[in-house]
């Protein structure tokens, strides 16, 4: 509890995205996030400028709450846009869907790993 969690997400665009996306990393234990980081321009670059030229490194620092109970937490990452929604109604945004190798939609965020808080 109270520690900083540092990680780097590697994004890879197969084509230039149609919309400008925000990125998020959530720390959760089966419910709403207990800590998170959101970025307007992942890796400091608008996603509309991403090309298929390789991986994009996107570093994050998340401060875990001082009163965070001990336990196991899952880190998830995803992208969302507000461009497809009415002005002022972004909320969680319109999240980009995640697909498995067979092309089946499996949700709107990718689990990265679990961490143990002591």
Where are these regions (language model features)?
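C-terminal luminal/periplasmic domains and tails of membrane-associated envelope-modifying transferases
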Residues: 1-118
């Amino acid at each position: 509890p109270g520690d900083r969690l540092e990680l780097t997400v590697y994004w890879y665009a197969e084509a230039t995205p149609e919309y400008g996306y925000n990125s998020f990393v959530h720390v959760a234990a089966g419910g709403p996030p207990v800590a998170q980081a959101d970025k307007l321009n992942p890796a400091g670059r608008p996603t509309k400028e991403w090309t298929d030229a390789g991986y994009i490194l996107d570093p994050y620092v998340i401060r875990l709450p001082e009163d965070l109970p001990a336990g196991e937490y899952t880190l998830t990452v995803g992208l969302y846009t507000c461009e497809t929604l009415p002005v002022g109604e972004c909320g969680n945004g319109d999240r980009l869907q995640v697909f498995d190798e067979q092309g089946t939609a499996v949700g709107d965020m990718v689990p990265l790993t679990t961490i143990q808080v002591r």
